[in-house]
């Protein structure tokens, strides 16, 4: 099996829901990171064999959003690509698929990642509208919020993912103060990383043109540097009366995109590319839908067994902070040291554009390894309906 190298990695700044990136479609955001990784590597779009992009909230946005993005990025129409929808794991699975394709010898240079505009997610009427409303008496036709329906609700039972996580937190005995401490640390680390310039290498700034002129967004909009455990403690429960989950200890609804350029050893030599890291392997796991926050643990354990490695072999970890519960599970059930986990903050502070987050945490992990002169990193995240993915990187 052939080695797979990461030769470029970029992400957009993450925009708050209804914030600066609201007028950028998922295709626009995807095009921006596609251009950025190609420019970073110094290769043309015509040298790509394939592109694979995660995307979840695509209803009403036209056919094949990754191809829309690729054409906007001036990648030739002779290069094809496809979308992956694995809810929050979409972008990571895109990277895993790209790596498997290269290992199998079916491609040498593949762009993979994910893109999501949660702000541009619309509403829909059911199929009843197509065939005519014969009788509406007692059965009104409501607009359905696609953000909730397709992105944040378990389709197997209609429960919200927040409600499910609230129950899981109670089962594990996680207290409000424990969850708020995780959230506060995320905000503090993200603020420190921003102020210290740690994100500068990974973020591809975006120009935003309006009637007021052109501005450049170069940092994440959701970070609240003044967050304290005390201020978080004043927030009301979000999903259950007297529950432990709040808007402050759950991830933010966000717009953004991230991408990585993967290459075989032959492509590295042919195009004189500079590898940043090697992908050691990826894994996935599934289980009871309502227990989705636990599944990154299973995926990580499978990956460690496959690689014949232990947690002690890894220097840094990223686990997507869909909820503070996610971090506590990763620490207590898997055994990851908090000092090694999400060292530059996570989705609670930065945001969680669901179709892009799997690639975003990989990009952040890669540059965190560089900043700290470390070698091995593992990234993982859960996804709705009961699953999780994990991937391991070795900086070179």
Swiss-Prot record:
Knockout or disruption consequences: Double deletion of phaA and phaB leads to loss of synthesis of PHB, no visible growth phenotype.
Practical and industrial applications: Poly(3-hydroxyalkanoic acids) (PHA), of which PHB is among the most common compounds, are prokaryotic intracellular storage compounds with potential uses as renewable, biodegradable thermoplastics. Cyanobacterial PHB synthesis is particularly attractive as cyanobacteria use CO(2) as the carbon source.
UniProt pathway annotation: Biopolymer metabolism; poly-(R)-3-hydroxybutanoate biosynthesis
Catalytic reaction annotation: 2 acetyl-CoA = acetoacetyl-CoA + CoA
BP terms from Gene Ontology: poly-hydroxybutyrate biosynthetic process
CDD domains the record matches: thiolase
Top-level taxonomic group: Bacteria
Enzyme Commission number(s): 2.3.1.9
Keyword Transferase: yes
Sequence similarity: Belongs to the thiolase-like superfamily. Thiolase family.
Further comment found in the protein's record: Nitrogen-free medium induces chlorosis in Synechocystis, leading to the degradation of the photosynthetic apparatus and concomitant accumulation of cytoplasmic polyhydroxyalkanoic acid (PHA) granules which in this cyanobacterium are composed of PHB.
Function: When expressed in E.coli with Synechocystis PhaB, PhaC and PhaE confers the ability to synthesize up to 12% (w/w) poly(3-hydroxybutyrate) (PHB) depending on the carbon source.
Subunit (UniProt): Homotetramer.
Protein name, as recorded: Acetyl-CoA acetyltransferase
């Amino acid at each position: 099996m052939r080695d797979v190298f990461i030769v470029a990695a970029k992400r957009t700044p993450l925009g708050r829901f209804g914030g600066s990136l609201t007028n950028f479609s998922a295709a626009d955001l995807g095009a921006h990171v596609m251009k950025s990784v190609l420019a970073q590597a110094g290769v043309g779009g015509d040298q790509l064999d394939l592109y694979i992009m995660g995307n979840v909230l695509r209803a009403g946005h036209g056919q094949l959003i990754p191809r829309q993005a690729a054409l906007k990025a001036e990648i030739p129409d002779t290069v094809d690509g496809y979308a992956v929808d694995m809810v929050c794991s979409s972008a990571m699975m895109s990277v895993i698929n790209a790596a498997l394709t290269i290992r199998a010898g079916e491609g040498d240079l593949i762009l993979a990642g994910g893109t999501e505009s949660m702000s541009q997610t619309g509403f829909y009427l059911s199929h009843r509208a197509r065939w005519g409303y014969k009788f509406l008496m007692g059965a009104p036709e409501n607009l359905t919020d696609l953000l909730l329906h397709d992105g944040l609700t378990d389709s197997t039972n209609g429960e919200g993912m927040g409600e499910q996580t609230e129950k899981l937190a109670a089962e594990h005995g996680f207290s409000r103060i424990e969850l708020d401490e995780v959230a506060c640390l995320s905000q503090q680390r993200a603020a420190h990383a921003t102020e210290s310039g740690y994100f500068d290498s990974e973020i591809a700034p975006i120009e935003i043109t309006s009637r007021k002129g052109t501005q450049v967004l170069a940092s994440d909009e959701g970070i609240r540097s003044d967050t304290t455990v005390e201020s978080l403690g004043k927030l009301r429960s979000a999903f259950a009366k007297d529950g432990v989950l709040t808007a402050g200890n759950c991830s933010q609804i966000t717009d953004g995109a991230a991408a990585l350029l993967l290459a075989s050893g032959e492509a590295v030599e042919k195009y004189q590319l500079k590898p940043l890291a090697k992908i050691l392997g990826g894994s996935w796991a599934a289980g009871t839908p309502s227990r989705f926050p636990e599944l990154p643990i299973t995926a990580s354990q499978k990956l460690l067994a496959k690689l014949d490695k232990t947690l002690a072999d890894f220097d840094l970890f990223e686990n997507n902070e869909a909820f503070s519960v996610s971090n506590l599970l990763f620490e207590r059930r898997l055994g990851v040291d908090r000092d090694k986990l999400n060292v530059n903050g996570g989705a609670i502070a930065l945001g969680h554009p669901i179709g892009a987050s799997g690639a975003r945490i990989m990009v952040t992990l890669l540059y965190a390894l560089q900043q700290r002169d470390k070698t091995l990193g593992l990234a993982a995240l859960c996804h709705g309906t009961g699953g999780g993915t994990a991937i391991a990187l070795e900086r070179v």
